[in-house]
Curated annotation (Swiss-Prot):
A GO molecular-function descriptor: DNA-binding transcription factor activity, RNA polymerase II-specific
Position of the signal peptide: none
InterPro entries assigned: H2.0_Homeobox_NeuralPatt (IPR051662), HD (IPR001356), HD_metazoa (IPR020479), Homeobox_CS (IPR017970), Homeodomain-like_sf (IPR009057), HTH_motif (IPR000047)
Annotated organism of origin: Danio rerio (Zebrafish)
Subcellular compartments: Nucleus
UniProt name for this protein: Homeobox protein DBX1-A
Designated gene of the protein: dbx1a
Compositional bias of kind Acidic residues: 305-314
Any single GO CC term annotated in Swiss-Prot or TrEMBL for this entry: nucleus
GO-annotated biological processes: cell differentiation in spinal cord; regulation of transcription by RNA polymerase II
Keyword Nucleus: yes
Length: 314
């Protein structure tokens, strides 16, 4: 079954598709696709004769209907152009009583709506010196607007829009550890272990921490601080006796440095000196070794000085 309304065009559009046979148009019968030529099909012949003698008629030398036709087309298509260059015909409000008025025509669509009292001025009619507000609208690009320009809406300035400089960089800093307070019993036990070995092993450190009720990190930090304190005292003693601090640190040439306390060394030397004081021939093995080394050093130094003298003389 075929639907007749779909196949056959309705009778309403027949006038738009072909002109009526009884219509005698004064215009030349050449094919044209202008809006005016399409709209004048439904106009009566009396209206066409009236429009032929409009005030915008051209001089006698030219065709009398070409210019008004173009003027009407410009009035219907772009009213702003005719207002700028001057109207070709007196401006009359379009009303629904006009027989040629079409509700959905080009003039009705392009005409300004009656609800808007004032139409926005075009960009061409604005003088460049009359800008009192920024030219760019907020909807154009919100990042172009600066905080120095007045804005009708609350726009956040550009420096505050970026949050990445305020983000935390890297890992968060760990808080400062509280200083551990050791009791006298804990301090004595730690000092006793330090006198046995300056560098405590990890298993012994864990055992000592469990025995004293401390954390492994607390025992580790205590030994580090105690070794630094001991090295400082050892350095002062070595510097006073002509040594250097590197003697207390393990190196390739000296992987096992002398880690005995300087105070104990000095006390042992004093005890040996006091014990050997009554006899003139009593010498401690350490003193004998030191004397032999001193004599060998002086002998070598004298030989070196003599060789230098010989070299300089020759």
């Amino acid at each position: 079954m075929m639907i007749p309304s779909v196949i056959a065009p309705p009778a309403i559009y027949s006038a738009f598709m072909r002109p009526a046979a009884s219509l005698h148009s004064p215009f030349p019968a050449h094919p044209s696709f202008l809006v005016e030529d399409l709209l004048r099909i439904n106009r009566p012949s009396g209206f066409l004769s009236q429009t032929a003698h409009s005030p915008c008629a051209s001089p006698p030398n030219s065709t009398p209907l070409s210019i008004p036709d173009n003027c009407r087309i410009l009035d219907r298509v772009s009213p702003g152009i005719t207002e700028k260059h001057g109207p070709c015909s007196p401006k009359t409000p379009v009303s629904s009583k006009d027989p040629t008025y079409l509700k959905f025509g080009v003039s009705a669509i392009l005409a300004p709506s009656p609800k808007k009292a004032t139409s926005p001025p075009s960009v061409h009619s604005i003088h460049p010196k009359g800008f009192s507000v920024p030219y760019f609208d907020g909807s154009f690009c919100p990042f172009v607007r600066s905080s120095y320009f007045p804005a009708p809406s609350s726009v956040v300035p550009i420096p505050g829009t970026f949050s990445w400089p305020l983000a935390a960089r890297g890992k968060p800093r760990r808080g400062m550890l509280r200083r551990a307070v050791f009791s006298d019993v804990q301090r004595k036990a730690l000092e006793k272990m330090f006198q046995k070995q300056k560098y405590i092993s990890k298993p012994d450190r864990k055992k000592l921490a469990a025995k004293l009720g401390l954390k492994d990190s607390q025992v580790k930090i205590w030994f580090q601080n105690r070794r630094m304190k001991w090295r400082n005292s050892k350095e002062r003693e070595l510097l006073s006796s002509g040594g250097c601090r590197e003697q207390t640190l393990p190196t390739k040439t000296n992987p096992h440095p002398d880690l005995s306390d300087v105070g104990k060394k000095s006390s042992e030397d004093e005890d040996e000196d006091d014990a050997c004081a009554p006899s003139h021939f009593c010498l401690s093995p350490r003193r004998v070794m030191s004397n032999s080394t001193d004599s060998s050093i002086t002998f070598k130094h004298s030989d070196f000085s003599e060789s230098e003298d010989e070299i300089t003389v020759s």
